[in-house]
């Protein structure tokens, strides 16, 4: 699918801005063509030291990237590893957030808990000003994720890669997430559509969110208001 076709898909679903997760060079090209339709997440190796910090600055200041992306799934370096700390400090200075992979992985050649929410707790304690979004919402450690969202003011989560229609199913493990997401944590949750992973149209995923037992103002927050505030899109 071309980017133009993808934007058409976004338009049909009522999506104004999408988040890009790809190689830095690919994202740079897309942002140059469609700067008002996408947010770019920068991928920087924790092994690159100050070279990586300088590259993050370049991507943000010259190429329009909006956040740092950290994923232990790929490099097997947990997000709380101190090699990431210069990057987190620079994110605070640049006033950009970081999206951290927070989920169990199914790869059999690496530890299953590389993305455990406990790593976020240490980061949030060490960098209280850093805006963090827990990508994939910490499944299957959902209760721990809920507790950490309550504990840290600048910690948020997104629902990418999880089918929304299962959030309300008894025994799914999402019970506390949905309960608190409709009340105390309503300002902390952002929707990730992941429609291609589900094999259904983008607008169908939006409809599944609309069918959840969420209060109307809460649904609006999940769908866009929380992301608008988190990414400073006002």
Where are these regions (language model features)?
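Active-site gating/metal-coordination segments in enzymes
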Residues: 16-17, 24-114
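Catalytic pocket-lining loop regions of alpha/beta-barrel enzymes
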Residues: 66-67, 80-190
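Short alpha-helical
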Residues: 25-26, 140-141, 197-200, 204
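Conserved, mostly hydrophobic/aromatic
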Residues: 10, 27, 59, 91, ...
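Mid-to-C-terminal alpha-helical segments outside catalytic/metal-binding sites
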Residues: 1-13, 17, 185-188, 199-234
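N-terminal cationic-hydrophobic initiation segments that often serve targeting/anchoring roles
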Residues: 10, 31-35, 60, 124, ...
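Short acidic active-site motifs
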Residues: 5, 26, 51-55, 141-144, ...
């Amino acid at each position: 699918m071309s980017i133009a076709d993808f934007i058409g898909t976004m338009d049909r679903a009522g999506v104004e801005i999408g988040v890009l997760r790809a190689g830095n060079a690919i994202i740079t090209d897309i942002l140059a063509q469609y700067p008002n339709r996408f947010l770019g997440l920068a991928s920087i190796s924790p092994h690159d030291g100050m070279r990586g910090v300088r590259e993050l600055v370049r991507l943000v200041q010259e190429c329009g990237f909006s956040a740092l992306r950290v994923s232990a799934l790929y490099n097997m370096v947990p997000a709380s590893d101190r090699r990431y700390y210069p990057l987190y400090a620079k994110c605070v200075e640049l006033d950009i957030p970081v999206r951290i992979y927070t989920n169990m992985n199914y790869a059999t050649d690496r530890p299953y808990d590389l993305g455990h929410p406990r790593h976020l707790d240490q980061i949030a304690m060490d960098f209280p000003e850093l805006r963090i979004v827990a990508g994939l919402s910490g499944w299957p450690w959902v209760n721990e994720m809920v507790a950490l969202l309550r504990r840290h003011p600048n910690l948020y989560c997104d629902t990418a890669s999880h089918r929304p229609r299962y959030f309300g199913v008894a025994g799914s493990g999402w019970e506390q997430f949905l309960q608190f997401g409709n009340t105390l944590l309503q300002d902390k949750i952002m929707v990730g559509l992941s429609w291609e992973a589900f094999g259904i149209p983008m607008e169908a995923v939006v409809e599944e969110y609309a069918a959840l037992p969420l209060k109307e103002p809460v649904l609006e927050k999940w769908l866009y208001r929380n992301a608008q505030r988190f990414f400073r899109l006002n």
